[in-house]
Each structure stands twice: as C-alpha cells, then as structure tokens.
Amino acid sequence: MRRAAIIGFAAILASFAGFAATEYDVMIPSNTLGVVKVTSAAEYLPLAIGYGAVSAGSDAEARADGLIMTSNLVAGDELFVYDHESGKYDVFGLEKAEDGTATWKSRRVVVISNGGVTVEEGTAAADTVLAPGYGCWLHRPGVASRDDKTVTLAGQVFTGKITVTIAAASGTKAFGQTLIGPPVPSTGDFHLNGGSISWTGAVKGDEIRLAKEDGTYETVKYTGTQWIRYYYENDGGLSRLKKDTDPVIPAGQAAWYARKAGNPSFNIEMEVK
C-alpha cells in the first residue's frame, strides 16, 4: 500500500517546485470513534487527516476511501491526494449507484514536472494510506447551489503525538508550503497557541494561511513566540487593525503552513488532548 502525504492540488499547480517531500510518524488510534462536520460553500475545501481508520491493529491510518462520509456529497465530487513517495497526485471521483451506494473510484494520476502536466492511469482508493497530520482537497463543483454544504469526517480518535514535516522553500520562492491538517481534539477547534503543537524550529515571518469560502486566504503570522491573526474591524466608521492572540484551525479543516525562505525544513509535533 502506498503511503500518501496530502497537499492541495490547485495550490501545487501554482507553486510547483516549492514543495519538498514530507514524512510522518504513524500514530495508533484508540478505540474511540470521532465525528466532525465542516460546513462550507468553498468549492475547493481543504480537509484535515484528523482521524485514523475505523479498525483495530497496528496499520490503522485512514484510507482515501474511508475518511470522508459520502452522504452529503454528490456524484462527480473529487478528492485530490499527493503521494510524496512517487511525487504524483492521485485523483478520486465519487460514483453513486441507483441504490445510493457511493464509491470513491480512481480517476487519474497527475504528474507535474518542468515539462508540464501529464496524466496516468490511477489505482484503488483503498490502497492509498492518508498521512495523519496533513490535509487533502475535496473538490465539489457547484457546491454554492447545493442545499447541504456539510462534509462529515469520521474515524478513530488519535492519541499522543503526531510528527509532521514542514517543507522549506526552494528556488526563488518566498515560502515553502505544506498543507497541515491537525488531528481533531476532543475540544473541537485546534488552538495554535495552546501548547498542542511544539513550534521549536518555527521562525518569525512564517505564516499559516486559512482558506476562506471566497477562495482567498486569511493569514496568521508567527512573531517568534506566538501566532497572531491580524484583521480589520469597523469601529464607528473607521477600519481599525485588530489582533487575535488565540487563533485556531477549525476542527476538521486543513491550512497551509508557509515556511519563510532561507530557513530549513523542520518537524512539528501535534499533540491530541
């Protein structure tokens, strides 16, 4: 079975050669089932690999065909998965039978190189292991017109710590980008300053970029000691700059870690509490 680190397909197309291969430490989930719902109108929705497979045993990471519940999805929705061992992108499409049975089917494997983009035949979703602590992209064409915009993730709750490698920038790029998807904690949202992650190795100027429904990003900046989200708020007709000293990655969602150029890759440890 291939072990796949996950990263956003659309962003990689725009920033090819800025991504370095990532590694991860596999955690063994407990026998506690977790469920989280993400409601969003975003067509490209970054989701966290926040749960393990609903099974016991030492090889209990989630698979591409098991993490995302299909009841609120429609035929034609696609899941994009980056395989760091092969450097290729697995694309899975959702198919639904007349009886309502839904199956993730391999659509294609996309290969991106300096020579352009090529497409190969894909492999089964059940054979693609999702790396805990990273993220994946769910593409839902026309989601804005759907009555139900909720995506449900389910699986076994992780315990202990998960190690994720943050990629360095390469070439002339200002940042190296890694899509991180924190394990879903019992408290819900993942607090960046709450001690759940060891930020040893992070540097002033690093950013975490949270996707918004309109396709833009909200930026959280690292000051050297903590993460702060800066935003503007209307105050008596004036737009004033505010700061949030307790920024979070919403439960079940993934976010880009943008590593400032000139700094090496490093590991972060995500602790589930």
Q: Language-model segments: what does each one mean?
A:
Residues S15-F16, G116:
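Residues in and immediately flanking transmembrane alpha helices
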Residues M1-A4:
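Positively charged n-region of N-terminal signal peptides that target proteins for export
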Residues K88-P132, T216-P250:
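A cross-kingdom feature marking solvent-exposed beta-strand/loop segments within repeated
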Residues I7-S15:
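Bacterial N-terminal signal peptides
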Residues L79-V81, F92, L138, I208-L210, ...:
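Fold-core signature of tandem repeat domains
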Residues I6-I7, I112:
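General helical structural elements
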Residues G18-A75, E85, A125-K204, A251-K273:
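A short, polar beta-strand/turn micro-motif
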Residues P182-R240:
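Intrinsically disordered, low-complexity segments enriched in Gly and acidic/Ser/Thr residues
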